[in-house]
Regions:
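Sec-dependent N-terminal signal peptides
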Residues: 6-11
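C-terminal motif of bacterial Sec signal peptides marking the signal peptidase cleavage site
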Residues: 16-19
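Buried hydrophobic residues that stabilize the cores of well-folded domains
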Residues: 23-281
Length: 281
């Protein structure tokens, strides 16, 4: 879900402004010259017995300032909210997390960026200011991710996982290994189109049981429009589910339709609908 949200936010923040009439200038639901995205709201509508609920549940709310910086992310459905903190250069250096209902402080992330070494590190702390985990991202000088290391500090420095990324002309390969012994946990091969989008992902998961190792293979497929926007994601051959995406005329995401199945009996179906509010600068 994180990747989907990052993709959708990128679509929202990358919009080009369109000209509007004077009446539209005062309409907070219409984008236009001299305006900025102030808020994006995501509402969930569940399906049951072939019918969609008329009553939606507030899923997530994103709020932005005039600099296009995220200033608040509220997640009522998941029960938390976060507040980013920026330095004078406009870089997010910290994120604080709170319980959505009680406003109880949950902890924070501290973020460090080293451009010279192409390294980005996130330190995660709990409400007692104890270090829980450290995640280090390493990039090439062309800003391609090549390695991600997660250390579970609350357990021990040798506990965690490593993701290693490698690239060819039309593929991306991701290998997930155990930090402690280097054993292979998962291998994913993404087939890429001319935009660099994954059109097919094949994932092999390795289970190292005492008597005999077992490997399971999962395949996901992705379809895009002529602008490189995702239209449909077909979930693994095991679940046989899918996600479909529709867009507004200005390119912003309008709706996600999600259906997860076991064989052909769909167990979970819902829509995520996106609405936007704009303000004058």
């Amino acid at each position: 879900m994180k990747k989907n949200i990052a993709l959708l936010l990128g679509l929202v923040l990358g919009l080009s402004f369109v000209s509007c009439s004077s009446d539209e200038d005062d309409d907070e639901n219409v984008n236009g010259k001299g305006k900025y995205l102030a808020e994006m709201t995501v509402t969930r509508y569940d399906w049951k017995d072939g019918k969609r609920s008329d009553e939606g549940k507030l899923y997530q709310i994103y709020k932005y300032n005039e600099k296009d910086q995220l200033i608040s992310q509220e997640s009522p459905y998941f029960g938390y909210r976060q507040t980013p903190i920026y330095n004078d250069n406009g870089d997010c250096t910290e994120q604080k997390f709170y319980n959505y209902k009680t406003d109880e402080y949950l902890g924070y992330n501290k973020r460090e960026l080293n451009l010279a070494d192409s390294v980005f590190i996130i330190y995660s702390y709990n409400w007692k200011n104890e270090l829980v985990s450290t995640t280090k991202y390493e990039y090439t000088y062309g800003y391609k991710l090549i390695r991600e290391t997660e250390i579970i500090d609350s357990i021990g420095k040798d506990h965690g996982k490593i993701w290693t990324y490698s690239y060819s002309e039309n593929t991306q390969t991701i290998e997930l290994t155990n930090l402690k012994d280097g054993s292979l946990i998962e291998k994913q091969v993404n087939e890429l189109d001319s935009y660099g989008n994954a059109t097919k992902a094949t994932i092999n998961v390795f289970y190292d049981f005492a008597l005999s190792p077992i490997t399971h293979e999962y395949t996901f497929k992705y379809n895009y429009d002529s602008q490189g926007r995702i239209l449909r994601k077909t979930h693994s051959t095991v679940s046989q589910g899918y996600t479909e995406y529709t867009y507004n005329n200005d390119g912003t995401i309008k709706k996600e339709h999600y259906a997860e199945a076991l064989n052909t009996d769909y167990k979970e179906i819902y829509d995520l609908e996106y609405t936007y509010k704009y303000k004058k600068k």
